[in-house]
């Protein structure tokens, strides 16, 4: 059961970009319509984030999600076990979900300023780290055109 719940938390974070501390503090009361509203633990700022279809499917699929809490280290230990079971040989921690959300958002055409708000960053420099990663990917892929001409 803990594997299923922890995987649910992880996948929810890949769809919303929430920090592990914020996911851990959520209860079903934080969800209204298509939004999740909460006070960010790190910044103490109120946040209200729209949930996409996949995020809503994740919370609707698992009724115990956000009812059971785990220590951060336990979550990361369980993620390692899940990756081993799935034969994924990567060092995956919960923060990877947030990183995945950020880079996916930018690759899909999202704006850095919007991402800053979604991630709850108080300084745009924090968000620009993700923009630089996406730009580096784009720069490396420009050489794919060499084979066409």
Model-derived features: where do they sit?
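N-terminal core-binding DNA-recognition domain of tyrosine site-specific recombinases/integrases
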Residues: 2, 68-74, 91-93
């Amino acid at each position: 059961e803990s594997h299923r719940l922890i995987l649910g938390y992880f996948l929810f974070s890949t769809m919303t970009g929430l920090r592990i501390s914020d996911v851990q503090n959520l209860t079903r009361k934080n969800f209204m319509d298509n939004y999740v509203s909460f006070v960010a633990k790190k910044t103490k700022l109120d946040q209200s984030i729209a949930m996409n279809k996949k995020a809503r499917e994740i919370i609707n699929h698992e009724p115990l999600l956000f009812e059971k809490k785990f220590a951060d280290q336990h979550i990361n230990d369980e993620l390692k076990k899940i990756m081993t079971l799935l034969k994924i040989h990567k060092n995956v921690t919960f923060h990877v979900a947030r990183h995945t959300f950020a880079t996916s958002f930018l690759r899909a055409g999202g704006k850095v300023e919007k991402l800053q708000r979604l991630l709850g960053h108080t300084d745009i420099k924090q968000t620009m780290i993700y923009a630089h990663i996406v730009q580096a990917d784009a720069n490396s892929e420009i050489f794919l055109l060499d084979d066409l001409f």
